[in-house]
C-alpha cells in the first residue's frame, strides 16, 4: 500500500488508471461517499505493486509507501535506482512483521450497535476499553452500564474487554473526587474492592484507570492506589492499564499528579493520551504534532519500559473560526468528517512538514473563515512508524465510534496485531 497526494487536475478515475486501481477500490479504502477530491488530499492506494510515474525516484516511492529504502531495494533486485522507467512495476514489501497490540476506547451505544462495531474492529484489535464507569467519593462505582453484549462480543472475537473507570461528573473530570478517595484509606480500599468485583462479575479482562486532573498533592497517593489495585487484580489474573496525559517533563505544574516512573513500575500498560496539544479552547494548531509526541515518548522511555507504552492517537480534529478570539470554542470533528468538509467546500488541504499534520481553511455560508486541523493517512502512518521506531507495545485511539475508514488498512500494513 502507498499514499497518493492529490494534485491539481487529479480525479479518482485518473489516479486509479495511473496505478491500476479501480475508483471503487480507492473510494472504499478511504471511506469516500463523493468523488470531488481536492488538491493536497492524501489517498491510501490499496496495492502492493506500484506503477512508476514520470520523474519518480526510488527514494520518493519509499516515502509514499512508508517503507525503508533498503527494504524497497531488496524487494526489487532487478530495478536500477538510477534508471527508473515510467510504467515499470515496483513491489512494495510487507512491513507487517512488527507484533503490536492495540487498545482503543469505545463509548457504548446500544447492544446491536455495540456488537456491529466490535465485530468490525475485532480483526484489528487486541483490547477495547469500554467507556465508562465513574466513581463516588466513598469509593463506590456510581453508575451501571448495559455492557453485556459488548463484553461477550469482544471475547468471542478474541479481543480483551477492559472496564474504563473515570472521575467524570456532570461538570467534567473531578480533581476533588479523586482527592477525597485517595486521602481516605477506607474509601480507597472500597474502590479497589469494587473495581475487582465489577471486573470479575461483569466478565472483563481487566481495567483502564482514567483519572484526569489529578492534583500534584495527590501524586504519591495516586501511585500507591494503583499499586494496591494492581495487587488485587493480579491475584485474579486481570490486567491493569492506565490512561495518562502526555508529559514532556516533570515540571509542568498541572501534570505533576502523574509520576510516570512510579506508575510505569506498577501498571501492565500505560496509554498515553498523545493529543489535544491544541484543543477546543485553544488557538488553532495541530492536535497531535509529531514533534511533541516524539518528545513525550523520549521522556517516557527514560522511566517506563517501552513495551508497556501505548501511544493514543485522536480520531478527531477541531474546526476553529479565524481570526481566533480568546474565549471562543472550536467544534470537534471526526477525521473522516474533516476530509468530507474539505471536499464539500473544495478547500485544498495543506500539510505541516514540521508537525506532520494536515489542515485546511474554508469559508462558510456566513462568510466566516475556518481553519481545521485533523489526522489523515499520512499523519497516522507517521505515528505508526514511531511505534515501530521506539519498539512500543501498541497504538490506541480515542474513540472507535468516530471512525476512520483507512485505519484498519494502516494497522494491517504496519503491524501484526496481537490477539487473545
From Swiss-Prot:
Matching SUPFAM superfamilies: (Trans)glycosidases, LysM domain
The protein's GO terms of the molecular function aspect are:
chitin binding; hydrolase activity, acting on glycosyl bonds
Q: Which residues form the LysM domain?
A: 2-45, 48-92
Name of the protein this chain belongs to: Putative sporulation-specific glycosylase YdhD
- Identify its protein family: Belongs to the glycosyl hydrolase 18 family. Chitinase class II subfamily.
**Key word NAD present:** no
Domain of life, per lineage? Bacteria
Q: What is the lineage of its organism?
A: Bacteria, Bacillati, Bacillota, Bacilli, Bacillales
What Pfam families is this protein classified in? Glyco_hydro_18, LysM
Q: What is known of its domains?
A: LysM domains are thought to be involved in peptidoglycan binding.
- Any other noteworthy remark? Transcription of ydhD is dependent on SigE. Cells producing excessive ydhD do not show impaired spore resistance, but their germination properties change: spores show reduced response to L-alanine and some of them germinate even without germinants.
The record's active-site residues are: 212
Q: What keywords are assigned to this protein?
A: Carbohydrate metabolism, Glycosidase, Hydrolase, Polysaccharide degradation, Repeat, Sporulation
Q: Which residues form a coiled coil?
A: none
Please list the GO biological process terms of this entry. oligosaccharide catabolic process; polysaccharide catabolic process; sporulation resulting in formation of a cellular spore
Q: Which organism is it from?
A: Bacillus subtilis (strain 168)
